[in-house]
């Protein structure tokens, strides 16, 4: 007698197809159906600024794909060879095998130059996207609880992206990349006591040595991308776990999200946007030349490229070095270089200031609540002013890093530009903060007037007694909600200095500092009180003009 057989039934009653059987097999071992059921209808809000994070993700994936292709042909070797290849102007020139293989990729490997340029453009877009994405998160307060850890992940990705870019464009060993390595070596040598030892350890001897490229290669293609890939995965997991932030609007609060489901709407849009990003980068790689290494020639320690500039995201670090006075201190037979070491130390500190801000603000406010509704930047003028001040400092230092380019193109004195940048480093961020804060307060006043008096229609009406007035149109409920939904919590205060028994209670110095910062950041001078319901009803009832 034949044994009974169990047949998998498909969704339409017939025998399951191969794809469905494979899915059933995977579900029996991984529980995919339960995972999909829990997340496929997860709602994601729809706003153009949320695409900034997706640009970063897609650029990172494109970097991995193009990087794998380039790795197949690049040889990270400092061994010197005589070039005999397709680029005739360099035939017979002594160069490293790394530079020779880069030339081979550019001229002999099918599609090699296109992939090289896509890779470089994707790196620039990746870092640019991360910075712009973090600024969106910063200005809207999306870093608040429970997303502080995700902010740290994002900041770490930005820092590692900058370091990965530095190691990447140092690999070809052309004159421009070698100049960048020399710049880094000078910064390392400026470290007191251990600088020389670190330089010898990194380069395997005196600069330039033969070990730096073989050592940078695994860091660039394995270590840093592996760490970044793990951080990207963790970042996305936390986005799913915490649910996405959303801009204020009707029906949106800290408990509900208004938007489109993950499947199929969001995934369809995400897939299309990935290919759109890839297409744009492919066009940039095919039409816009970047880093023509053959034009620079091989690196030689006694040569330097006129107008040598790093990628934009490292320009501010060079600006720090260029505008710093060339101080030198001789102490007990040792030479200290504060003119290099101080700006070299400020490089990570400027980035660190951005990374620690969420924790500083949380300590000042003492706010322990979860926040899923984004702030409008105008409603938090001090935070917005600080962000603009940080960006203005970045731009000023970027100009300082290109002072020679500015001088030659605009026919200006390089010394005048250097002194302008030195003064601007201290003046411009302060002015940017003040102007931004005043603009935010002005926008708050305009919002208050719009809520109480409505929108200007441009229609002028003459009253019976001869007075001319402009007709205002009441705002829609959606607009009223957007303009008035924000909370205006009182700032942290120390409270009474004596208790009910008249005994002076101890107050720590940190509490005084916290209270002072709270007044400066969230006190009455930093906001325009939004209209109350009573004021709105009184104005709209017609009792007042």
Task: Label each PLM-derived region with a short phrase.
Residues 323-339:
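Membrane-interface amphipathic/re-entrant loop segments adjacent to transmembrane helices
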Residues 2-323, 341-545:
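Membrane-embedded alpha-helical bundles that constitute the cytochrome b-like, heme-associated redox core
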